[in-house]
Amino acid sequence: MTVYTSSATAPVNIATLKYWGKRDKSLNLPTNSSISVTLSQNDLRTLTSVAASEDFKEDKLWLNGKLESLESERTKACLADLRTLRKELESNDSSIPKLSQFGVHIVSENNFPTAAGLASSAAGFAALVVSIAKLYELPQNMSEISKIARKGSGSACRSLFGGYVAWEMGQETNGEDSKAVEVAPLSHWPNMKAAILVVSDDKKDTPSTSGMQTTVATSDLFQWRIKEVVPKRFDDMKDSILRKDFATFGDLTMKDSNSFHAVCLDSTPPIFYLNDTSKKIIKLIHELNKREGKIIAAYTFDAGPNAVIYYEQENESKVLGVIYKYFSKVSGWEKLDTKTLDTTSDIQADPELYKGVSKIILTEVGQGPQGSSESLINDKGLPKAVAN
């Protein structure tokens, strides 16, 4: 039996200008444009291997060792679009194998908790789409491929690029102009770092999709956000990235996180993603910036309580020094020589704050999807390792 295989990795991205709200649920078209930073795959990534064979009678997906249902409309939409593009190639070249007619086996693994507010669906769908596009030898560029990833998970389209990325909401009803574009590559501003404080490993109470629908349907503040606040902030944030102006970038990032959680709170019933630990971390970062007399650290929170703190390499000792002072008992500091940190800060915070954080992930801006020589699939097109 002939088995065609391909593997790719894709990164997590963390939005600094938030995507929240759909204008078309089936196509995953957003109500506003968004911006994100792609994080290093050394710390957070999804690896996906795909196989196609004439002998595979159906599509199958294994996620983190377990066979999962492929009945999700989102996944089916991605596979259908990829097959359509492959069919176009096959119709123009009769010598290439008819992979579009074969079943595909998809094996995917994350190196971080799934559905814990760490953008697992973004990396997952990005890796899925890129690995199959690679298998199918599709000629489309990453912006074009991002439109397919978007149908799987809106924020997945931003994981198609490294560095600093914008998802342009577009205007077309068919979504043809709703795609990800590079604002600046990793090499433009390589000293951006991020500390992720994992506040909860649990699945969140209100999934993003249902939360968005509630906000769009019930929040008056949301309309103000998408019409007045985000369009200007989108331009200003892109400009701050191009100028490598951290103070402006950080200010806009924190304001947009707060704006996003404000519209969640303004929804009926209100949606609470931040917990007490999250709020104390927010206060800690504001105290740090106040002490420094300028913004050297910026928090952002997605649809969950986990904090992502952005800072520049040159301020690492000060920023991580304050975080280490209160979270030294939490795992995740192993990759850093903590003796280099400035822990002399007189900033006061709850000494029990560390109890609300399960681990810390120290990472930085990173590259986009990469082809991988590592494969999760054996020569029969089945997972090399399957959970019991």
UniProtKB/Swiss-Prot annotation:
Q: List residues traversing the bilayer.
A: none
Reaction equation(s) it catalyzes: (R)-5-diphosphomevalonate + ATP = isopentenyl diphosphate + ADP + phosphate + CO2
Cross-referenced SUPFAM superfamilies: GHMP Kinase, C-terminal domain, Ribosomal protein S5 domain 2-like
Entry's Gene Ontology BP terms: ergosterol biosynthetic process; isopentenyl diphosphate biosynthetic process, mevalonate pathway
- UniProt keyword ATP-binding present: yes
For this UniProt record, give its keywords in alphabetical order, as a comma-separated list. Answer: ATP-binding, Lipid biosynthesis, Lipid metabolism, Lyase, Nucleotide-binding, Steroid biosynthesis, Steroid metabolism, Sterol biosynthesis, Sterol metabolism
Recorded hits in Gene3D superfamilies, A to Z, give: 3.30.230.10, GHMP kinase, C-terminal domain
Positions of (R)-5-diphosphomevalonate binding: Y19, W20, G21, K22, R74, S153, G154, S155, A156, C157, R158, T209
* Chain's role: Diphosphomevalonate decarboxylase; part of the second module of ergosterol biosynthesis pathway that includes the middle steps of the pathway. The second module is carried out in the vacuole and involves the formation of farnesyl diphosphate, which is also an important intermediate in the biosynthesis of ubiquinone, dolichol, heme and prenylated proteins. Activity by the mevalonate kinase ERG12 first converts mevalonate into 5-phosphomevalonate. 5-phosphomevalonate is then further converted to 5-diphosphomevalonate by the phosphomevalonate kinase ERG8.
Q: Can you state the subunit structure given in the record?
A: Homodimer.
- The entry's protein name is Diphosphomevalonate decarboxylase
Gene behind this protein: MVD1
